[in-house]
Design a protein with these regions (language model features):
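TPR/TPR-like (Sel1-like) alpha-helical repeat modules
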Residues: 268-274, 340, 344-375
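TPR alpha-solenoid repeat register
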Residues: 207-209, 247, 281, 292, ...
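Short, conserved sequence motifs used for protein processing/export or organelle targeting and
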Residues: 1-180
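Structural marker of alpha-solenoid helical repeat scaffolds
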Residues: 201-202, 237-240, 274, 285, ...
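Residue-level recognition of tetratricopeptide repeat
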Residues: 170, 179, 204-206, 213-215, 241-244, 253, 278, 298, ...
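Alpha-helical segment of the N-proximal tetratricopeptide repeat
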Residues: 167-202, 210, 217, 312-318
Length: 396
């Protein structure tokens, strides 16, 4: 798909993981089961986002006007993956192999939203067909199995087990696993790196390319040099070749962090200005990628700051570069008029260009659109109070 999964009405789409554990005919545990009313256990892992209003209440009935901040975002980006960790304790008397089955399930509307619909349709005199007023609502909307898999684990001292070979290539499974951990942020970067090293051992460019991303994300001592080396190994692949636009973007990020601003500017211009045959065929247009545009604008801004000298030639060159950076950030605002980074940099640029009035406009916009971390924290505290399960499941 060309968008996040799930997309659209994410306040009510219900996508969740159902996990069951068995040993022989004995059920040992489960997550993601439904109650008698058809609602899913709130301690389950949901593939959605959990939006809050200013009071920490969930946005759950199409009240988009009240959206304030996400508590978590579990949507899966295009071509990406997601990892979820489960822990369990086996009874001491288990002797048969452990069977674990996982299903990703989809239902168009969750029970919270359908209860709201049921209430409103009853008030309008048009109750939902089949529901007797005064009886508890049961969510009987159809459930689709998006994907499922199972694995069998041996028990110490028990019989050996053999799992059927997977149709999905091993490198792809390692790569997806690594991407899922990479997207979790700092907490699981080391595990992501190990997964990407396995991908590289299996002969795919994705391994060193994504390893470079993880190293840049962590950016400890010497890791930028290691990231640059990994990126060179990825670029050396030819069958298949690493996407040149991704290589250029990561090269720019690394060069920028290492102070090689001229090289970084060249890299970012490659991403936003070049159009290869493959990009045209696949309808890729990175000239509208405002993340890269902002990186380009910041790099030009930094290079302008490096121009020294008080003679007219130096002043003219510096002003020209500052104006060039302005134009790049204005391109970002044509795409995203509320882009905080663009407004912040434009405020700084116009200040240096002596345009105080324009600087003030963008300073005000930056203050208006930037995230209020204090208010966000209060909303999250309220949400955790009302939904204790979220303290664990929002970061699972």
């Amino acid at each position: 798909v060309g968008h996040h999964f799930t997309q659209g009405t994410t306040d009510s789409n219900e996508v969740w993981l159902e996990v069951t554990l068995k040993s022989g005919d004995r059920s040992l545990g489960a997550s993601g089961l439904m109650g008698p009313d058809g609602s899913v256990d709130e301690w389950s892992h949901f593939v959605n986002n959990f939006m809050l209003d200013k009071n920490g209440n969930r946005i759950d009935r199409r009240n988009a006007q009240d959206i304030f901040v996400p508590l978590y975002q579990h949507q899966i980006p295009p071509g990406s993956g997601q990892t979820v960790h489960y822990s369990f304790r086996l009874p001491d008397d288990v002797s048969e192999p452990l069977q674990v089955k996982v299903r990703l399930l989809y239902r168009k509307f969750d029970s919270t939203y359908m209860q709201y619909v049921d209430q409103k349709t009853a008030e309008l005199g048009r109750p939902i067909r089949g529901h007797q007023q005064g009886q508890p609502w049961r969510n009987e909307l159809p459930i689709l199995v998006v994907a499922e898999d199972s694995v069998v684990f041996p028990i110490a001292g028990g019989a050996a087990v053999e799992n059927a070979p997977r149709e999905i290539p091993e490198w792809q499974r390692w790569n997806d696993y690594g991407i899922g951990m990479l997207l979790k942020g700092k907490a699981e970067l080391r595990q992501a790196m190990e997964a990407f090293r396995r991908v590289e051992e299996l002969g795919r460019y994705d391994g060193p390319l994504n390893l470079a991303r993880a190293l840049v994300e962590e950016a400890g001592p010497g890791q930028l040099d290691e990231a640059a080396a990994a990126l060179q190994r990825a670029a050396a692949h030819s069958d298949p070749a690493a996407p040149p636009w991704t290589v250029a973007w990561l090269s720019g990020v690394i060069n920028r962090q290492q102070g090689r601003l001229a090289d970084a500017e060249t890299n970012f211009r490659q991403v936003t200005e070049e159009r290869t045959e493959e990009m045209v065929r696949r309808k890729f247009d990175f000239s509208r990628d405002y993340i890269v545009l902002n990186l380009l604008g910041q790099t030009i801004f930094d290079r302008a700051q490096q121009i020294r000298g008080s003679d007219d030639a130096a002043k003219e060159k510096r002003l020209a570069r500052l104006q060039e950076a302005v134009e790049v950030f204005r391109r970002t605002l044509q795409i995203d008029s509320e882009n905080v980074d663009a407004h912040y940099n434009l405020a700084q640029l116009y200040q240096q260009l002596g345009a105080a009035e324009q600087a003030a406009v963008h300073q005000q916009a930056h203050e208006k659109y930037k995230i209020d971390d204090t208010a966000r924290g209060l909303g999250v505290i309220d949400a955790h109070r009302d939904h204790p399960c979220l303290a664990r499941t929002c970061c699972a």
